[in-house]
Amino acid sequence: MERQQIIESLRRIIPTESTEYNERLISLGESFLEWSKYKHNLKATEELCRPYMAAHLACELLSNDLNLEINLLATPIPKKKYYKLFTYFQEILSPLTKSLAAKDDLMETITYLCTKLGGSTAIPYVKQLVKAVVTNDMRIEHKRGIIIAAYLLVSAKAFGKDELHINHTERRKAQSVLQDTSSALQIQYWMHVLSESWQYKEIPLNGIEGYESQKQRIKPWSGIASMIQIDYEKRLQNYPIWKACIEERIQYYKSQLEKDGTAS
């Protein structure tokens, strides 16, 4: 539905004899439309402008690359009011537009993500995995999902963990960095696909030199904070034992209560 809304809006903004529009343009418009629903509330009377503004913003961002001639003769509401609404729409989504513009190149996106999350030594491995699966005709959101899946796989292998078990904390961080809206199931699907590639099998287990120490340095701890972190990690490791003990106690007290009830 969102895709069709963007295509309909593009027909009004960049009229052309062709019935097909650049896939990159459509995907970008879809991203703006989807994210605007979380970032920008509109009045009921203004809601019909949302897909139009998302398509308009995508056209503005890619006008030079795609040599687009933008035509705003058929705005959904009077032009003066529309321009005021669109200006605010741009401001709200400016962090997203800047990040998408800066990270349009896949390899740059990978470098950006890994560096942002403190795993720059993983960059070449993530790039290898992404190249193994991504094709030029893929939609932007699918490419972002693949990048995140590749990052999670490499990160897990570097720490010697179960590669196909999603670390949801890391996933959410990565998705936040790339403004990605893929579901956990979609990410997991791509992880399975990538794990079958020979590029993945060639990554050495625990073999990414400096990765673990680098990840630890990204958020330095000092003094009491460091002690709290270490204590937390120990407690986390002991959680299954603690849980079993608690459950055993609960069962014991339940049985005692049942005995008391029977005796009375």
From Swiss-Prot:
Gene Ontology CC annotations of this record: chromatin; cytosol; DNA replication preinitiation complex; nuclear origin of replication recognition complex; nuclear pre-replicative complex; nuclear replication fork; nucleus
One Pfam family from the record: ORC6
Protein location: Nucleus
Molecular function terms, GO-annotated: DNA replication origin binding
Keyword Nucleus tagged: yes
UniProt KW Nucleus keyword: yes
Transmembrane stretches, start-end: none
Superkingdom of the source species: Eukaryota
One GO term of the biological process aspect: DNA replication initiation
Keyword tags: DNA replication, DNA-binding, Nucleus
Function text: Component of the origin recognition complex (ORC) that binds origins of replication. It has a role in both chromosomal replication and mating type transcriptional silencing. ORC binds to multiple sites within the ars1 origin of DNA replication in an ATP-independent manner.
Subunit structure: ORC is composed of six subunits. ORC interacts with cdc18, recruiting it to the ars1 origin of replication.
Family, as annotated: Belongs to the ORC6 family.
Name of the protein in its database record: Origin recognition complex subunit 6
Organism, scientific name: Schizosaccharomyces pombe (strain 972 / ATCC 24843)
